[in-house]
From Swiss-Prot:
Residues 50-66 have a biased composition (Polar residues). Optimum pH is 7.5-8.0. Part of the signal recognition particle protein translocation system, which is composed of SRP and FtsY. One of its GO terms (molecular function) is GTPase activity. It comes from Mycobacterium tuberculosis (strain ATCC 25618 / H37Rv). HAMAP family: FtsY. Optimum temperature is 25-37 degrees Celsius. This is Signal recognition particle receptor FtsY. The SRP-FtsY complex formation results in mutual stimulation of their GTP hydrolysis activity. GTPase activity is stimulated by Mg(2+) or a high concentration of Mn(2+). Increasing Mg(2+) decreases the activity. GDP acts as an inhibitor. It is a peripheral membrane protein. Its main location: membrane. It is an enzyme of class 3 (hydrolase). GO terms for biological process: protein targeting; SRP-dependent cotranslational protein targeting to membrane. It holds the Pfam family SRP54.
Amino acid sequence: MWEGLWIATAVIAALVVIAALTLGLVLYRRRRISLSPRPERGVVDRSGGYTASSGITFSQTPTTQPAERIDTSGLPAVGDDATVPRDAPKRTIADVHLPEFEPEPQAPEVPEADAIAPPEGRLERLRGRLARSQNALGRGLLGLIGGGDLDEDSWQDVEDTLLVADLGPAATASVVSQLRSRLASGNVRTEADARAVLRDVLINELQPGMDRSIRALPHAGHPSVLLVVGVNGTGKTTTVGKLARVLVADGRRVVLGAADTFRAAAADQLQTWAARVGAAVVRGPEGADPASVAFDAVDKGIAAGADVVLIDTAGRLHTKVGLMDELDKVKRVVTRRASVDEVLLVLDATIGQNGLAQARVFAEVVDISGAVLTKLDGTAKGGIVFRVQQELGVPVKLVGLGEGPDDLAPFEPAAFVDALLG
């Protein structure tokens, strides 16, 4: 019995000694002081190898507005019952003001031009309005050459009749020479024969083979450019508007240049025509440089892909050298942007000899390519057409027959002569 007790005591004592040794060793290690310096902790490179020269740019994060917080008072929170307690105050119903519906603004209405009157109707009006010319030219000549053989006094009467009708010396001499040759053949026996001969001679004098087309077709890189010149009071601006109406009706995109900057009424008139026919218009302040406005009009025509640019120039007297030089400047400046295809001279058919003096000066300055005779319905003569072509060497391309939008007609020699003879 005692032997077992001693063994148990020895085992317990051994365990106590082992535990004491272990505890002492742990305490010893914790209290040991190291005399070597502790290594410094380095900064860990987390750049991924990118440097300032690696092409990456840095930008500031855009500031975002915080989302508007919703008022959750009275609403169940997380963990609350799904139903509102009976003792909770009831939420009132409030009227919420909603913004009124605003309809989208309608696009401005594009004015639609009235349908162009057919050319046949215009030629009939030409015949009727030139009826007064028969006394001076048509009936007078028919009465002379339809009576049979003519002596020298009769031929002098024929010549005087032509001069009174404003044909001018050159055209008169040419017509008399042709009539003498045709009547000398002896084939003219009746008044109808005389009328047929006179008709052929007058048509031939108007040179029906001349090109009377308006050069208004666009080029590959820019629109065609038409310059309209003339003195004040000839209907120049009205002619530009009427021509624009015809071009727009033909499907052309037209830009009007209001280069008549000396009269505000001229630019306003052209603006009205543009709105009426559906064309664009370029204008400057009153007194602006006409050449600059003309240049801007061509520039806009090119940018907008227009087909035609019509430039209305300031009316000027042919005796004013400074104003004529300015007209030359307008053409030169426009030519820097695009070539000028047509220079139309607008003449008043009622002014006779003075109109030819104007035409000669304009032809020398801007090299006109065609003439437009306005107010042809107001003349009792009509011979100015022959004289313009004879002395200027350019065709009469258009004739104005009144103030109506369709009273601008293409000039056709045969129809004009028929209107003269009735």
